Amino acid sequence: MSFFKNTRNLVTVAILGAIGAILMILNINIPSIMPVFIKLDFADLPAIIASFAFGPTGGLMVCLIKNLLNLILASNTMGVGELSNFILGCAYVIPAGFIYKKHHNFKGAIIGSLVGSVTSAFVGYFSNYYVIYPLFTLTGLSMSSIIGMYTLVFPNIDTLWEALLYFNVPFTFIKFLLTSILTFLIYKRISPILKGKKKRNCEAREA
């Protein structure tokens, strides 16, 4: 693949992955609205930027790098949280990157981001139920304890399906929608730098 043959692309993606890992650590609790273990972060901002700049492969690589770094340096979930973040991040940046690559304009970016946000919320609903939360029980948490964290916020929750539907699905969609808005605000300003166009333009003027 041409992406892997371009050293500049690889270095840029590695830097974006490192930034993503830092943003994962700078997460925000949302008390009284979400269970304590669900936190807001914008760690996928570098990933969606990479997906727009270099295609879906770039976005996927940033998701992989940031989660590997977080697993090594800051994980307290035995890798389960990183796996969840990787799944949701890829479900967001891959469709968004494909759509933007095909429709390389602002409308394409909006549609791609919306599709990615919906896809991530949908994928997260099932991946959490069948993969992530069962893995959490292997770390010492019982499923009843997990559901209990939801009932502290909304006592009418009875099942994991309900918990995921009422909390995780809208939270995931809104999180990636906010990430998309931030991307729209900064992408055009940094895109030439990411792709090295600004430097080449300066060199051309000097010549």
Predicted regions: what is each one?
Residues M1-A207:
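Loop-helix junctions at membrane interfaces
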